UniProtKB/Swiss-Prot annotation:
Binds 1 FAD. Binds 1 FMN. Residues 679-907 form the FAD-binding FR-type domain. This is Self-sufficient cytochrome P450 monooxygenase CYP505E3. FMN binds at residues 507-511, 585-617. It comes from the Eukaryota. It comes from Aspergillus terreus (strain NIH 2624 / FGSC A1156).
Amino acid sequence: MIKETEQIPGPRPLPVVGNLFDMDLEHGLECLIRLADDFGPLFQITINGEKQIFATSQALVDELCDESRFHKAVMGGLEKLRMLASDGLFTAYHGERGWGIAHRILVPAFGPLRIRNMFEEMNDVAQQLCLKWARQGSSTSINITDDFTRLTLDTIALCTMNFRLNSFYNNETMHPFVKSMLYVLRESDIQSMLPGIANCIRVKARSRMSKHIQLMRNMARGIIQERRDQAEPVDDLLNTLLNGRDPVTGEGMSDDLIINNVITFLIAGHETTSGLLSFTFYYLLQNPHILERAQNEVDEVTGGERITVQHLGRLTYIDAILKESLRLMPTAPAFTVTPKKPEVLGGAWAIDAGQAVNVLLPVCLRDRSVFGPDADEFRPERMLEENFSKLPPNSWKPFGNGERSCIGRAFAWQEAQLVVAMVLQTFDLVPDDPSYKLRIKETLTIKPDGFRVRATLRRGQSATGLSQGSMSASGATSSVASPGPPAATGAQSNPAGGQRISFFYGSNSGTCKALAHRLASSLMGRGFTEQKLAALDTVVGNLPTDQPVIIVTTSYDGRPTDDAEEFVRWLESKRPVLQGVSYAVFGCGHHDWAKTFYRIPILIDDLMHKAGATRLTALGTANAAVSDLFSDLELWEETNLLPALREAFPPSNSSDVESSEPHQLQICVSKPRRVDMHRGLVEAKVTAVRTLTSPDSPEKRHVEFHVQGDTTWRPGDHVNILPVNPLSTVSRVLAYFQLAPDHSITVNSFNTQGLPSATPVSATELFSSFVELSQPATRKNLKALAMAAESKTDEQELIRLHDSYDALVRDKRVSVLDILERFPSISLPIGIFISMLPPLRLRTYSLSMAPSFKPSHGSLTFSVINEPAWSGNGQYLGVGSNYLASLTPGSLLYLSPRPAKDAFHLPADQFNTPIIMICAGSGLAPFMGFIQERMTWLKQGRPLAKGLLFFGCRGPHLDDLYYEELSEFEDAGVVEVHRAYSRAPDDVRAKGCRHVQHRLVTEAEAVRDHWGRNAIVYVCGSSNMARGVQTVLEEILGTLPPERYVAEIF
């Protein structure tokens, strides 16, 4: 039995005017929100003689979104807007025939791939915004809402209609369409609230509205006619409007329907998005910690390089910020539904068929029963995917509901993500008026009113640099003819074998060289022949045109590797003509070096394409911070490179086919040999070693060495070390393959992956010095191992490992050797095993001795990694650290100094520039060099500015590194040391502090004093420590300019 329904509450209406006096024509939304507070989750008012019901809770909205019971109603201001857009997608009545035709034609035009393909046009307009702000300078007060309106209007016109409004080239006034639109939206809202008689006497207002409507429709007609006059068709939304056919009726759209939807897209495609962007930046500037996290995410994901569509999916915090902004300020603040038949809403309130019910989003989306007691606060974490996915149904509806929801949501979202990311990447923003309180400007949509900002370019960028960057990004190019081989007219195959390929790399430490060798080896087994494998500098001016060119390279602090400098210089300055060259680029990077992430691979890829070369496939990338480089290379090879090669250079005969068997190296036993396969290394002699920690703490060691010749470095620099695999790991290999340590192995193969070729090497030397034994197995390795397993159970388990690769193999550091030992039924020839192993790479460490302190000497301070393996198989031994720990005085090691980024060096003016050094554990290494350099200066009689060191460790008798040396330096006035002990915070030296960030708070006054004297802050340590330090420093000091806050993360 249905219980008796209740009367819907609300303020008492007056005769004739209803609740008009309960509303404010300028701030109607604010009035409705107040009424929701007064009357609860469902209330009603009478406006213009009609009853209007408003729902304000998630539970009621969940019912109203049931399309089997309710459908969209076009009422109020939206109905008045039909004078402009009639049966356009947004203003059409439910079931209106024109809406059905347009909807069925247009929905496919907003599919994911089509939206992704609009990215470059979105990027074009976003760059115009950034260039305008950059040229105006940091002293200019920016009306951010107006500029976002220019941006979003230009973007929708360009992306969907290939029509440039060029709003940023008319800085003083808005485009006439915007002025007319704002008037029509506002007037529609006002007319919906006034009695009919009042509207009748507003003759001038109605006349102005008619003129504005005519202007907007004439503009739409002009856009349509210009397209019809074009000889060449353009595949965009406007083309779909003009030429699309309804798959149900076979009809196209009438001219009026086309005009209605052109106007609809120009309005709906920009008005709400500009409001979203404006509110988002308001909330970010009100919450600096959120702004910092967002900016850090952009830097980490993009690496400071040109934003691409692939980056957007990784901007998870930006995504949450936008969702949270729309939750608090839904820019289309209501949608209206009506029941198909009489309904009882919420089990209590009767709703007649045809009665409009408005979903009041600014209240619904702050429902405390869903979003908690802090629902009014801006907290993006609640919108991260793991939390967002757990919200009750229909809790977040800013884009409307069901079949009448916004079909351009993906367009708006991609645009908003791009713009937020680009602005955060390019500028530091501050409010123009720090005391500004949010005011809302209402039409049928909402935006901030009077919100202005100032924008300062980040990281020393310039407006000129942005201009040049945008030209490059948009594809502008000029070329100068240069002599070279004639362009190839088609794909050619090598009659002696498969299609020839040349591989070129840029590699300082050997990683990219190893990747190039691995890629060459893999393709050799797929019907291709290696023509050449060499450094990029060897091919300057002579790129082959009769075969594909594959490039594997990286960046070092934004610069090319040593063996690619001439090649990049040639591309940049000589502007060669590269027609006939077919190429693909694979780039490596690490997101901790955010400013220069993938810079050189992207640069090479872009310059070669602009010089006329044919890009075989999109740039492949691998981020060493979050993935396995070799697995990423294999994935790119399988999904991108190989299909492109097969299409561009098809096999010339049946023998040129991909082998299903892994390539097996040809092996014979011979005499031993040891070689140095890496360029640029110098020999050093170990002069001293010592353990810096007690037996009760994880081991940290000091290794000092002497280098002859003119090898130099600066305090703060790094050094690449050529290691040797731990003997225990090598012994496992020898035992598995039943080799004696002094067995000789000779590698005879057309591709040796950087191994010594046709030269006998002892088994111990081969597995110690030439290959990575602890590298995680790749997906391709797992496939081959599964094929080699004789046990069906083992085969199935290996397939399971392949299918759950990240969790079960990569993240647990499971090597090929681990798998062989775990699955004894695998029968794997040693040649295939060796072919699965990447070449042994160099390891990088910070130097911990200043060359001025002890000429021709250097030292390393490092943690020795010897811990239970995450795979569960014995101990995991860090290759580099265990090698260094095995050295004794007199041992030889091979190394190559490598400069740190410029900012991570002592200031040039040490007399006037204090320094603040913050670190934990072995992060002390570079600062020992800093302090020693300062000691040298002091001994030379040079005055020094103050220096503070904040150092964290476990305790005074555990791992308080270099305690005696630092005490001497402190006594000499070189540095002032502040310690934190995680296991002994009560020690007098720690002053109750467990971590360095706690000690920073304790010494906040000294930190502020040094900062006020233009100190530079240096941080070295783990990412967790660095984040904590930065948070505390922001609280103490405020904004940290990048030139004065420099972090090195390991």
